[in-house]
Design a protein with these regions (language model features):
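Post-transcriptional modification and biogenesis factors for structured RNAs
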Residues: 132
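Short beta-strand/loop motifs in extracellular/secreted proteins, especially
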Residues: 161
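ATP-dependent carboxylate activation and anion-phosphoryl transfer catalytic cores
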Residues: 2, 7-29, 33-35, 49, ...
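ATP-binding N-terminal substructure of ATP-dependent carboxylate-amine bond-forming enzymes
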Residues: 1-127, 136-152, 415
Length: 465
């Protein structure tokens, strides 16, 4: 039996996305909100809403005690964390279970394993899936021996290398080093940044992958020992190490033909080995980085639903949120091993930001909002708008500046591109400054049309006249 009432522990478009599926399944929903989000669409969409604190996320959407109080007050029997905020925090998952509710996501010990990049590397290695060559333990930066070891590893894997904070993400605590003379300084800098941003001073190093592509595999596992790969997503259109456009299937040339299909099969198998190693449960994404030769290396597991999950839904016809709910309720997944993947889907994240000024966030009001030539927040076979705002909303500096996701599907990649471009052409978000025009510039570019782009492409394109 599915849950009677689910508390959605998030905001914006993902909260609305979860609420929509719950409503279709006859599940009552509870929204939480900050003072800044009192009139937000996710609040009005839900059956109940509870104020959990003031605007800053640390005092509201990250306030575990306040959220647990809302859980108790409303009698919800399960918690869906969405993405971001508390979605991958094992302490929160444990607290939900201790409160007598179900956390709709992986087990706390799984969140611990994949929330630590060193542990995740060890899991991948033990599963026979290769991470990017580098150190398998944190570097002892405070000792001469530790620095010497780092230099030896760097010499072995070859320059340039990248120093990373173990607790880092989104490009924070990461620095490229081109020669030995820069290692010691980079180790200290990344360690200091990691400590300040993530309360974790540990660092490690990896080979720097030139012209990298970011490719990920959607996996789904249940409590009955089943694990499935639902295809790959290409996520290489990025700025500041964060995604703007995602698509499925990947248009990378090394995935074409019979050899490409074999490479995909190997990629899916590599992803499944990793999640099976820890007895994974629920939705997850195994992220890989590909070099210009098509060699694929494990990066990490995002132990939650991804922002870009709709592109997988569009090509498979599955509702991943529904699958999350069913798995969390103990149901056995249907056989998804050979689920048909049809056509091509592309998602664009629409942000309140200025691409001409380094993609700097641009908070402000949204007085006029027209989606897709007046079609509204459409949910059709070929087009979806996943929005967290309405006319009269205000993009505040307290949260991520994403306004919405627009997702298009077509029988072919060209058809999907055309559908997405038409949708964006007919979209007005005023007077806000957004990246919508830049997304259309990406869609029109020769590199994107050819599928010949990497993670540096968007920032290069933004500087073109």
């Amino acid at each position: 039996m599915l849950f009677e009432k689910v508390l959605v522990c998030n905001r914006g478009e993902i909260a609305r996305r979860v609420i929509r599926t719950c409503k279709r399944l006859g599940i009552a929903t509870v929204a939480i909100h900050s003072e800044a989000d009192a009139d937000a669409p996710h609040v009005t969409d839900a059956d109940e809403a509870v104020l959990v604190g003031p605007a800053p996320a640390k005092d509201s959407y990250l306030a575990i005690d306040a959220i647990l109080a809302a859980l108790k007050k409303t009698g919800a029997t399960a918690v869906h964390p969405g993405y971001g905020f508390l979605s991958e925090k094992s302490a929160f998952a444990k607290a939900v279970a201790e409160a007598g509710a179900v956390f709709i996501g992986p087990r706390p010990e799984t969140l611990d394993a994949f929330g630590d990049k060193m542990k995740a590397r060890h899991v991948a290695l033990s599963a026979g899936t290769s991470p990017v060559p580098g150190t398998d333990e944190p570097i002892a930066i405070d000792t001469a021996e530790g620095v010497a070891h780092a230099k030896a590893i760097a010499a072995k894997v070859g320059y340039p290398i990248v120093v990373k904070a173990v607790g880092g993400g989104g490009g924070i605590g990461m620095q490229v080093v081109n020669e030995e003379a820069g290692i010691e300084r980079a180790l200290k800098s990344c360690s200091d940044r990691g400590k300040a941003s993530f309360a974790d001073a540990r660092v490690y190093l990896e080979r720097y992958v030139a012209q990298p592509r970011h490719i990920e595999v959607q996996v789904f596992c249940d409590t009955h020992g089943q694990a499935f790969a639902l295809g790959e997503r290409e996520c290489s259109v990025q700025r500041r190490h964060q995604k703007i456009i995602e698509e499925s299937p990947s248009p990378a040339s090394f995935f074409t033909g019979e050899a490409g299909e074999r490479r995909k099969a190997e990629l899916y198998a590599a992803a499944l080995r990793v999640v099976k190693k820890v007895g994974y449960v629920g939705a997850g994404t195994c992220e890989f980085i590909a070099d210009d030769q098509g060699n694929l290396f494990f990066l990490e597991v995002n132990a939650r639903l991804q922002v870009e999950h709709p592109v997988t839904e569009m090509v498979t016809g599955l509702d991943l949120v529904e699958l999350q709910l069913r798995v969390a309720a103990g149901e056995k997944l249907p056989d998804l091993a050979n689920v048909a993947r049809k056509g091509h889907a592309i998602e664009a994240r629409i942000y309140a930001e200025d691409p001409s000024k380094g993609f700097i966030p641009k908070p402000g009001p949204i007085d006029e909002l027209v989606w897709c030539g007046g079609a509204g927040e459409v949910q059709s076979r070929t087009l979806r708008v996943e929005s967290g705002v309405k006319a009269g909303s205000k993009i505040t500096p307290y949260y991520d500046p994403m306004i919405a996701k627009v997702v298009a599907w077509g029988e072919t990649r060209d058809a999907a591109i055309a559908e997405l471009d038409r949708a964006l052409e007919g979209t007005t978000i005023a007077p806000a400054t957004t990246n919508a025009s830049f997304v259309r510039k990406v869609l029109a570019s020769e590199e994107f049309r050819a599928g010949a782009y990497d993670t540096k492409f968007a920032e290069i394109l933004a500087k073109r006249a």
